[in-house]
């Protein structure tokens, strides 16, 4: 004779905490999603670690944190921002790699994968301009790495140009936009609106917007970085002007370190270069 299955029930003899614990375990096994606040908190923690690793120049941690965030990429509640910060981790891994003379192939792979993540972020949230800004920077760096391949350069330029123009139209007061546009102006010829002073003008505009509190959000999953990076680029630019302004370079670098004292690039690479140029 077949036995009837017995429905799951919690014995009344179990203590209340134990009953709740058993129920939570059962619900977890059934695939019930964790509360949004709990997931949000964990992602925010990982994002903070990513930004710290970026400033510290810790490329290994950036790779690991990119992978750690992958655990949340299927959560539709946070999919756009998870993709953004995964892309950010690889983007900054590549930028730090330039300072360490990492193999160009490795830099290219990181940047291409970052582009994919930023595209995912934009696909989920088309109005999230920061993903376009970051993707534009990655494409610009890929152009630099592809200088010996004119067809590849043309392909990347055709993609980066419209993307950054769209970002300018959508978010003209975003400080991070000016940080990304600056290098394109620095290296562009004068007859195309480029030049060293044009780039510095963009960085100053971005810094002014950052000081006004533009480009910030109450949600820590939305990017708010930018001011330290703009100060850093102003320091670098004044150091590398045709006629260097070393006092300005030093002042901007010190201001960046005041905001981020553990910034490896500014503290250990840029500041020594400025001091050497000053004859110290």
Whereabouts are the PLM-identified features?
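N-terminal secretory signal peptides that target proteins for export/translocation
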Residues: 1-15
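Bacterial N-terminal signal peptides
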Residues: 19-29
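Boundary at the C-terminal end of the N-terminal hydrophobic targeting segment
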Residues: 33-37
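Short coil/turn linker motifs that delimit alpha-helical repeat modules in TPR/alpha-solenoid proteins
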Residues: 38, 75, 82, 124, ...
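Short coil/linker segments at helix-helix boundaries
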Residues: 45-66, 89-127, 134-166, 180-232
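Residue-level recognition of tetratricopeptide repeat
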Residues: 79, 128, 174, 213, ...
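TPR/TPR-like alpha-solenoid helical repeat scaffolds
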Residues: 217-238, 264-280
């Amino acid at each position: 004779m077949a036995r009837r299955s017995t429905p799951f029930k919690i014995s009344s003899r179990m203590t209340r905490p134990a009953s709740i614990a058993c129920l939570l375990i059962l619900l977890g096994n059934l695939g019930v999603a964790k509360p949004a606040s709990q997931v949000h908190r964990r992602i925010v923690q990982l994002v903070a670690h990513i930004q710290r690793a970026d400033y510290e120049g810790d490329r290994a941690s950036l790779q690991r944190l990119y992978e750690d965030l992958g655990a949340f990429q299927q959560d539709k509640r946070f999919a756009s921002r998870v993709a953004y910060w995964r892309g950010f981790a690889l983007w900054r891994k590549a930028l730090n790699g330039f300072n360490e003379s990492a193999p160009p192939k490795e830099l290219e792979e990181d940047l291409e994968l970052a582009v994919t993540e930023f595209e995912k972020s934009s696909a989920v949230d088309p109005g999230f301009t920061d993903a376009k800004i970051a993707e534009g920077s990655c494409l610009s760096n890929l152009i630099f790495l592809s200088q010996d391949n004119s067809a590849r350069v043309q392909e990347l330029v055709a993609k980066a140009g419209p993307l950054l123009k769209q970002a300018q139209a959508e978010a003209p007061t975003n400080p991070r936009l000016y940080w990304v546009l600056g290098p394109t102006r620095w290296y562009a010829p004068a007859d195309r609106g480029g030049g060293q002073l044009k780039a510095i003008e963009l960085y100053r505009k971005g810094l002014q917007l950052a000081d006004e509190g533009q480009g910030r959000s109450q949600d820590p999953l939305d990017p708010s970085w930018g001011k330290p990076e703009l100060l850093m680029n102003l320091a670098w630019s004044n150091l590398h002007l045709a006629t260097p302004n070393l006092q300005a370079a030093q002042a901007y670098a010190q201001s960046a370190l005041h905001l981020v004292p553990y910034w490896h690039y500014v503290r250990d690479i840029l500041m020594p270069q400025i001091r050497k140029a000053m004859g110290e």
